[in-house]
Amino acid sequence: MSKILGRLVSRLNQIRRLKESRKYITVNEYFSQVKSIIFTNSRHLKEENKKFGKLNGDITFYVIRRTPPGAGLFSNYLLVLMHLKYAELNSLTPIIDYKNYSNYYSGKSNSTSENYWDNYWDQPTEYNLDEVYKSSNVILSSANISKLLEKNYGYYDLNSKKFLENQRQINDFNGISNSIKLRRSVKEKVNNDLKSIFASKQNILGISLRGTDYLNTNLAKGHYKPLNIDEAILLTEKKLVEWKMDYVFVCTEVKEYIELYVERFGEKALFLKRQRFSNSQSEKFITQYRFRRNNDSFETGLEYLREVYL
């Protein structure tokens, strides 16, 4: 009886959490996930084998997708890297599809949706989605491949401590990451940022600080707790001396952190000028907050991408 009750509670909790994302996904996606929770105790997409048409009979395509509405830009990116490794290990031809699955960057999926991936990065193949969805051998990916990668191939989840302690796997995935090229227009913006922010400056320490939804223990389950701002500044002071650095580049979505770094380090504090959030905006996932500007979802993703690449 207790096991049955536990399963029921688990399903009800998942449906409750799904309701929080309801306005970011389509009606069909919502009820499909509710159905999946009821029958499988998981809302996430499962791997499927499909035959959509007669094209490319000698190729097996691997469509990389994520359960709508997905997550933040680099959470999605890391998931794609793991799927690309799986495709490589199984001699599959990968393509990333964020057009037919609702997400925070291109909105609810519809007939006019863009594949937001193509706004930031090139595809890992010369084929396009239209051709793939007319082909005879297509695998639609599961939402997350990390457990299968570890169980069958010994590759660790990119978010895990075990991965960060394995230099061979770091090098392996670094190679995969380098094969994913920034879209030319984005690359040009990054190069301009490099020139305008760093110019001829040398000996620059980089620090990445998360706040906002990472400070909410209910939203950040499964994530490591970030340094608080006092800890970060103390560590920065120590490393500037220890590593003989002249500047510190601060990568963060939190405007208060930038202000405190400028207050403490003055002109030694370097940063990308962009829209940032307040730490008080921690009641929802950061991807659910919006700035009042045209095409904000794309612009916020682009600013984050440029900052991380610096």
How should these model regions be labeled?
Residues 1-22:
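Boundary detector for helix-to-coil junctions that initiate low-complexity/charged tails
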Residues 18, 23-236, 242-243:
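Secretory-pathway glycan-assembly enzymes, especially type II membrane glycosyltransferases
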Residues 244-310:
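Donor-binding and catalytic core of enzymes assembling or modifying cell-surface/extracellular glycoconjugates
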